[in-house]
């Protein structure tokens, strides 16, 4: 398990933790609204759309925490709602399939974080008069990036949970296993 300095800094910056840990610790970078994690402050309130890199970046393409994972096959954008829906699908499947065993041994890591605000103008508004207000958050995903990692579960359960989560995501994904 090899982590670069950049990936360690990103994990520290975005504090990839569960909702209960966020509410207990009161971190400065991550804020909780319902069950959704998003940055508390950004340098600018509005960003440009930008382009998703088509090439595969070496950072974040290997499993770093769990035994199984979900990897993106294409570059694109993931909304904070899609990330949360996929996370809930994985947890829901594990709770149904394994009952109390998942609570004792199972663990999930979310390796993507929606940190870019998306803006939108209200309907029936004329052109001009500046950029719209922030309406949501997205994460840019590159080809081959690990989205979720799982550990403490069987291969069959992990594969089925990855299939359920893939239906919630707007990117094509594949199931990977640590070797």
UniProtKB/Swiss-Prot annotation:
The keyword Ribonucleoprotein applies. Pfam families: Ribosomal_L16. One of its GO terms (molecular function) is structural constituent of ribosome. GO terms for cellular component: mitochondrial large ribosomal subunit. Coiled coil: none annotated. InterPro entries: Ribosomal_uL16 (IPR047873), Ribosomal_uL16_bact-type (IPR000114), Ribosomal_uL16_CS (IPR020798), Ribosomal_uL16_dom (IPR016180), Ribosomal_uL16_sf (IPR036920). The keyword Kinase does not apply. It is found in: Mitochondrion. GO terms for biological process: mitochondrial translation. Keywords: Mitochondrion, Ribonucleoprotein, Ribosomal protein. Gene3D superfamilies: Ribosomal protein L10e/L16 (3.90.1170.10). Its main location: mitochondrion. PANTHER family: 50S/60S RIBOSOMAL PROTEIN L16, LARGE RIBOSOMAL SUBUNIT PROTEIN UL16M. Component of the mitochondrial ribosome large subunit. Belongs to the universal ribosomal protein uL16 family. This is Large ribosomal subunit protein uL16m. It comes from Arabidopsis thaliana (Mouse-ear cress). The lineage of its organism: Eukaryota, Viridiplantae, Streptophyta, Embryophyta, Tracheophyta. The gene is RPL16.
């Amino acid at each position: 398990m090899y982590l670069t300095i950049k990936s360690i800094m990103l994990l520290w910056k975005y504090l990839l933790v569960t909702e209960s840990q966020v509410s207990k610790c009161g971190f400065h970078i991550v804020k909780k609204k319902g069950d959704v994690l998003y940055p508390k402050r950004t340098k600018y309130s509005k960003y440009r759309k930008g382009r998703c890199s088509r090439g595969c970046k070496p950072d974040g393409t290997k499993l770093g925490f769990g035994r199984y994972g979900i990897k993106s096959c294409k570059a694109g954008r993931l909304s904070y709602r899609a990330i949360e829906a996929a996370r809930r699908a994985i947890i829901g499947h594990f709770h149904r399939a394994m009952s109390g065993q998942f609570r004792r041994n199972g663990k999930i890591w979310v390796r993507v974080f929606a940190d870019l605000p998306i803006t939108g103008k209200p309907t029936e508004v004329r052109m001009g008069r500046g950029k719209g207000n922030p309406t949501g958050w997205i994460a840019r995903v590159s080809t081959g990036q690990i989205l979720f990692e799982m550990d403490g579960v069987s291969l069959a359960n992990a594969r089925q949970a990855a299939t359920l989560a893939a239906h919630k995501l707007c990117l094509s994904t594949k199931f990977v296993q640590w070797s």
